Amino acid sequence: KSADRLKVTLPTPRQTTATGMETDDEKTAAPVTSPDKKYTAFIKNHNIYVKETATGKEKQLSLDGTLGNYYSAYIRWSPDSKKVASCKIRPVEKRYVYYVESSPSDQLQPKLHKQEYAKPGDELPFKIPCIYDVETGHSVIPSTDLFSQQYYITAPEWNSDSQAITFEYNQRGHQSTGYWNFLPQQESTPVNR
């Protein structure tokens, strides 16, 4: 009788990003074309830029991005192509947990895998959703009072009318989680809490 084998499927970096714990790939995502195809948004020197498709002219939207407080390359265009949304990220030193896959199906030698794993009390990455008007460069950044104790915040998504972004917020300790609407004209408000 053959022994039963236990197979453990480890998350890929993309899956880990969904939990808000892995932020390295937020620096290197591909440029994003606007819905009307007139612009491309991208990260350069830790800041958000847009480039006109027709002329190649670049315009810097954010001015305060640094290595220790940078803008995510996961940029979302509003459906009307007038604004972009992203998150400003304060990264932290990461801790990892390691797993040994003792009997991989594709080779004889064991494989070592690692996954980012913050311990209780460790500082976590901090994200602030933000909106930039492409034409004027005007920025709208919410007060972080309502989500200062974040475990994670997802990348913002635009509502179909281009008037607000929605993001998921999970409080550290998981006592509070929900979706938030951020309207540039108003404060952030909880939805479905």
Language model segments and positions:
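Blade-terminus and WD-like Trp-Asp/Gly-His loop motifs, strongest in beta-propeller folds
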Residues: A30-Y39, I43, Y74-K83, A155-I165
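Short glycine-/Asp-/Thr-/Trp-enriched loop segments that recur within the blades
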Residues: E22-D25, T66-A73, F147-I153
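Predominantly five- to eight-bladed beta-propeller fold
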Residues: R5-L6, P13-A18, L61-D64, G68-R76, ...
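Structural motif
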Residues: N45-Y49, E93-V100, F126-I128, H174-N181
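Short consensus segments that form the blades of beta-propeller domains
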Residues: K38-T40, E116-E123, E168-R172
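Extended hydrophobic/aromatic segments used for targeting, binding, or gating
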Residues: Y169-R193
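Long hydrophobic segments that form regular secondary structure
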Residues: D133-I141, L146-Q171, P184-Q186
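Short loop/turn segments that connect beta-strands within beta-propeller blades
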Residues: S2-R5, T53-G56, D133-G137, L183-E187
